Amino acid sequence: SSNGNIGTPTAFDQTLLPVSAGVYQIVKQYGTNGTAGAAGYPYRVIHKPVSGSVKVGIGSTEIRTADWSVVTTTGRITLAANIGHAITGISKASSAVVTLGAHTYVTGMSVGFKSVLGMTQINGLRGLITSYDATTITVNINSSAFSVYTSGGETNTAPQTGETVSCGFEFDWPVRFN
């Protein structure tokens, strides 16, 4: 597996290689910090992950399978199209309530925050939506000690600048029999 060869895969085992906007290649890292490992290369491209074994994360949040797809003959992962909404309010609470106006988010989606004024501590964070209604979402971010929200900001499902996209998976070792 991607988790130490025999461990259960997690969404954070291996950093994905960007191919194009929203498209990533699965790789197995060897060595440390980009140096060659025992295989002689810093990573190996994985073309055929075991179907049903792939998990994907953005930052430190595992994202639901409905928000990405994998081609098990190429090892390419495609993230769903970005969904973004302007923020009009954020509560100070153990689970932040974010006011957006009409939106298309649902429970389980992962959203990142940027460009918020006042409550700047939330910028760059990512949380899972735990509940929603027509104009708000509740995320698993404790904002109770943050500054008061004043204005602006947006939420996005796509990775924010600086966020790592990672995955875990099982794969078969290539073997040749003579």
Which role does the model predict for each range below?
Residues 2-73, 78-83, 106, 170-178:
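Extended beta-strand solenoid/passenger and fiber regions
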Residues 62-67, 80-178:
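Small/polar beta-strand repeat architecture
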